[in-house]
Amino acid sequence: MFRAAAPGQLRRAASLLRFQSTLVIAEHANDSLAPITLNTITAATRLGGEVSCLVAGTKCDKVAQDLCKVAGIAKVLVAQHDVYKGLLPEELTPLILATQKQFNYTHICAGASAFGKNLLPRVAAKLEVAPISDIIAIKSPDTFVRTIYAGNALCTVKCDEKVKVFSVRGTSFDAAATSGGSASSEKASSTSPVEISEWLDQKLTKSDRPELTGAKVVVSGGRGLKSGENFKLLYDLADQLHAAVGASRAAVDAGFVPNDMQVGQTGKIVAPELYIAVGISGAIQHLAGMKDSKTIVAINKDPEAPIFQVADYGIVADLFKVVPEMTEILKKK
């Protein structure tokens, strides 16, 4: 039996929706916006109400201008100061709190990247609310879905906090359109520098390959490769596929590759069109980071390897024979 909502209930629901407002904290590198921010904006629009974006940095005019064109954003707030170099959470938190106080946002969110995971717990603590991490769906303005038990179960969380603070899994939401928007831009609230931490420098690994979390094709290697030198087999294959290269935690812990290549529950979450797992057994922690891939190909000489349970295609063979053969075939095409 269906029961119609009373007119009064509908009016109250509509009134609540009008008062919803969300602040998205933009992650960027001054001259370019991190792709996960566009996914976070899409999630924010699902909440209803007005969506604003806060951009803090040293020379972030270009990012602010780009955000004004993104569909779904009503306002872009810009804060430029030397203390925001490196986007340190100690400096960003007072800025976010001042912005929230000025506009009375009901929701504050960022992508579930290293940036968001570092920043939002501090913001939530200062607001005296409990944060919700790594959401994959939004059911209503106060109800969210996230994974638990390494992705083997879904947990629906109802949040009654005065301000909802949450991080968004980028692979669970489409990227917002980068055109069609007409947001206004204005200066954000000014705050005094905290200066308890200082940004010194960062050294980034340069690569001509796509960034791991945004690549359409990912080739990942595990302990089965036996050494870091053997990862060259994957690099050669990836070059033919214009793919990013990842690794399991076992390969990272063994010192084969740096930890920024790790895919899994404690690494990066990816959902490419094609994921090729080479010499990876398929531990539950690794599956949590890649099982949303559209097509999964597994190469392993052990037919009982758990990776085959989630793979769309499996090759039971010696990777040291199969991978070079695949590379040679692709070179001829």
Swiss-Prot record:
Q: Which SUPFAM superfamilies match?
A: Adenine nucleotide alpha hydrolases-like, DHS-like NAD/FAD-binding domain
Q: Which cofactor does it need?
A: FAD
The organism sits in which domain of life?
Eukaryota
Transit peptide residue numbers? 1-19
- Give the location in the cell: Mitochondrion matrix
The record's annotation in InterPro entries points to:
DHS-like_NAD/FAD-binding_dom, ETF_a/b_N, ETF_a/FixB, ETF_alpha_N, ETF_asu_C, ETF_asu_C_CS, Rossmann-like_a/b/a_fold
What is the recorded phenotype of mutating G116R?
A: In GA2A; impaired protein stability and loss of electron transfer activity
**What are the recorded Gene Ontology BP terms?**
amino acid catabolic process; fatty acid beta-oxidation using acyl-CoA dehydrogenase; respiratory electron transport chain
| Keywords attached to this entry | Acetylation, Disease variant, Electron transport, FAD, Flavoprotein, Glutaricaciduria, Mitochondrion, Phosphoprotein, Transit peptide, Transport
Q: What is this protein called?
A: Electron transfer flavoprotein subunit alpha, mitochondrial
